[in-house]
Amino acid sequence: MSLIRAEENIRQALLLEDIRRKANKTKNLRATAGRVSRGATEVMVKITGFGKGGGHIKAHLDYNSRNGKVELENDRGEVFSSQEEIKEVVKEWGSEFSDHKRRQNQRDTMHMVLSMPEGVEPESVKNAVRDFAKDVFGKNHEYVFALHTDELHPHVHLTVKMLGHDGNRLNPRKDDLRQWRDDFALAMRDQGVDAEATPRASRGIVKKPESQVIRHIEKGDKTHKPRKSKVKALKELEVIEEIKAEINGQPPVERVWDKMILQQQRTIRGAWLGAANELRETPDPSDKNLSGDIQSFVAAMPKIDTERHEIKARLIERFSIQRENAQVIPGAGQTANQIETSPKSKEPESKDLER
């Protein structure tokens, strides 16, 4: 019974209760729990967009091939490495979706990026994507892919034709994307990489990664200086108003989303610990070892802070806020770039940021 209860807890911790998966047996769940608790590398699979029309698709493949400088490989295993070969492939794909052959706003291709963190061998990523694409799309859809190594994290751009050989079109849903992450993680493990595909929440992470657009804005480029994004500036001003209201004695604003995150994390962490307790009661030494790994994993999880909590803590530290002196809080009418640091003052009382 302990293993059955352990399985139930692991499923809950991995947010699998309502999702149909491949081969979700106890052995597989325990193996997943082991990889997660060991800190296995997490894969990234993302749909970046869809191609509509020959011109759009040609531009996308030109980018993926770096205008013929990066080789493309297709679903038949054919590799195109010369600029002439690559240009011919791009031209062929583009002409197939000329305007007179398609409906308006029709999605012709799906664009995906499959990525691994810095330090993973790029060729292993490419090999895993080759196996993944063949398994997921190879029977019914044409595709091409290209490995990019111009950034620290190796990644592959995969372009798939939406229309299948059987006349049906791809219609990817959220569950499909999650299954594809699982499939890619398995393909990476076949390459010798300890990889997993679990939700951020199952690992105790509540913040979404910063979007590429915001990173680009704040980093700047050849034509734009680094600057704070409007999204971040507005979030800061919203938190400033909240702090001012609390200093003036107003009750904190109840945020339903924060409460939901906190409750979910309590449930997930409780489920992990429940699994650890059940595994500890089994006679199998490997289960007892896994129990200890899970307990250490939960103990090392980050504090349950949302992005708003982090902004609030950062502003409190930045301005050394005194409860009795609301004047040190910048005015709500200011932009974030106009805010100036006030003189140092007495540290504020610690506040519970998890409510």
Language-model segment annotations:
Residues 1-355:
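N-terminal nicking endonuclease/strand-transfer module with a His-rich metal-binding environment
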